[in-house]
Swiss-Prot record:
<keyword id="KW-0520">NAD</keyword>
<feature type="binding site">
    <location>
        <begin position="130"/>
        <end position="132"/>
    </location>
    <ligand>
        <name>NAD(+)</name>
    </ligand>
</feature>
<protein>
    <recommendedName>
        <fullName>Malate dehydrogenase</fullName>
        <ecNumber>1.1.1.37</ecNumber>
    </recommendedName>
</protein>
<feature type="binding site">
    <location>
        <position position="106"/>
    </location>
    <ligand>
        <name>NAD(+)</name>
    </ligand>
</feature>
<feature type="binding site">
    <location>
        <position position="113"/>
    </location>
    <ligand>
        <name>NAD(+)</name>
    </ligand>
</feature>
<feature type="binding site">
    <location>
        <position position="93"/>
    </location>
    <ligand>
        <name>substrate</name>
    </ligand>
</feature>
<comment type="similarity">
    <text>Belongs to the LDH/MDH superfamily. MDH type 2 family.</text>
</comment>
<comment type="function">
    <text>Catalyzes the reversible oxidation of malate to oxaloacetate.</text>
</comment>
<dbReference type="GO" id="GO:0006099">
    <property type="term" value="P:tricarboxylic acid cycle"/>
</dbReference>
<dbReference type="InterPro" id="IPR001236">
    <property type="entry name" value="Lactate/malate_DH_N"/>
</dbReference>
<keyword id="KW-0816">Tricarboxylic acid cycle</keyword>
<dbReference type="InterPro" id="IPR010945">
    <property type="entry name" value="Malate_DH_type2"/>
</dbReference>
<dbReference type="GO" id="GO:0006108">
    <property type="term" value="P:malate metabolic process"/>
</dbReference>
<dbReference type="InterPro" id="IPR022383">
    <property type="entry name" value="Lactate/malate_DH_C"/>
</dbReference>
<dbReference type="GO" id="GO:0030060">
    <property type="term" value="F:L-malate dehydrogenase (NAD+) activity"/>
</dbReference>
<feature type="active site" description="Proton acceptor">
    <location>
        <position position="188"/>
    </location>
</feature>
<dbReference type="Pfam" id="PF02866">
    <property type="entry name" value="Ldh_1_C"/>
</dbReference>
Length: 327
């Protein structure tokens, strides 16, 4: 028996990340090879022609799972009955723009989108915010949607997670698929803390294999934290395909389960590990049956606590910077 199509809303559909994302969703990479999808694409009025061009290409791929496409500049049309919403579109930082101005510009976008989701999306919609600053944008959307469950709103830390996995694989000479229990705490920003103290390869401790605190502090964490900037420097454009891939991974595992593997998601805190309530924070989680669960009982040593405090401080400052816009 064929499954009913799932409705997937994507904002910023004409952008670089959107272009890397849509074909993979339509191919079944995100929701499964037996799950038809209807894509509901949102972008600004001036981007509608570009979105139509992308849709022409989607049609030309003749994806068996693509059951329909909606193109719109109205959030209420894009989010109507959405089962999954990928909030990719955000205001990028322009030259000379203060961080405060960036936060405020995005707060306006994500307040509108949060309210629209609240009004028209499926009550079980799974929302992933990709557009930066992702954690705070997710917090704003969540706060603007009081009738949806808090846990429906998440921020993308999976790119940091995947970047960290790749660096550890390179350092240990082991395949990336063999690394388990590596995760990231905090904000999707250079302050994130990638933590491999519990990580294993084939049951052996990664920390013991590497055994190099200087590498951890001076090479590993800065490389992962500043990878986005390094890609812009090299490519002249921001990381789009790897961000799209991380979004696919995040939603795939959330919907279909991570099979016991620990992954990283930015989720609203309930006070776990001393993080204040409602802060949208990167946590180690496992996922099953469409739900995520924070990994409990991890010991936080003094070094890790210091790193967690730094990223938390940044998130609290961002939150304070938009609080007056949330009414």
């Amino acid at each position: 028996m064929a499954k009913a199509p799932m409705r997937v809303a994507v904002t910023g559909a004409a952008g670089q990340i959107g272009y890397s994302l849509l074909f993979r969703i339509a191919n079944g990479d995100m929701l499964g090879k037996d799950q038809p999808v209807i894509l509901q694409l949102l972008d600004l009025p001036q981007a509608q022609a570009a979105v139509k061009g992308v849709v022409m290409e989607l049609e030309d791929c003749a994806f068996p799972l693509l059951a329909g496409v909606v193109i719109t500049d109205d959030p209420k049309v894009a989010f109507k009955d959405a089962d999954v919403a990928l909030l990719v579109g955000a205001r990028p930082r322009s030259k000379g723009m203060e961080r405060k101005d960036l936060l405020e510009a995005n707060a306006q976008i994500f307040t509108v989108q949060g309210k629209a989701l609240d009004e028209v999306a499926s009550r079980d919609v799974k929302v992933l915010v990709v557009g930066n600053p992702a954690n705070t944008n997710a917090y704003i959307a969540m706060k603007s949607a009081p009738n949806l469950k808090r846990e429906n709103f998440t921020a993308m830390l999976r790119l940091d997670h995947n970047r960290a996995l790749s660096q550890i694989a390179a350092k240990t000479g082991k395949p990336v698929s063999s690394i388990e229990k590596m995760f990231v705490w905090g904000n999707h920003s250079p302050t994130m803390y990638a933590d491999y103290r519990y990580a294993t390869v084939d049951g052996k401790s990664v920390k013991d294999m590497i055994n190099d605190p200087v590498w951890n502090n001076d090479v590993f964490l800065p490389t992962v934290g500043k990878r986005g900037a390094a890609i812009i420097e090299a490519r002249g454009l921001s990381s789009a395909a790897s961000a799209a891939n991380a979004a696919i991974d995040h939603v795939h595992d959330w919907v279909l389960g991570s099979n016991g593997k620990v992954v990283t998601m930015g989720i609203p805190s309930n006070g776990e590990y001393g993080i204040p309530n409602d802060v949208m924070f990167g946590y180690p989680v496992t996922t099953a049956n469409g739900k995520y669960e924070i990994v409990k009982g991890l010991e936080i040593d003094a070094y890790s606590q210091e790193k967690i405090n730094i990223t938390l401080k940044e998130l609290e400052e961002e939150r304070a910077g938009v609080q007056h816009l949330l009414g």
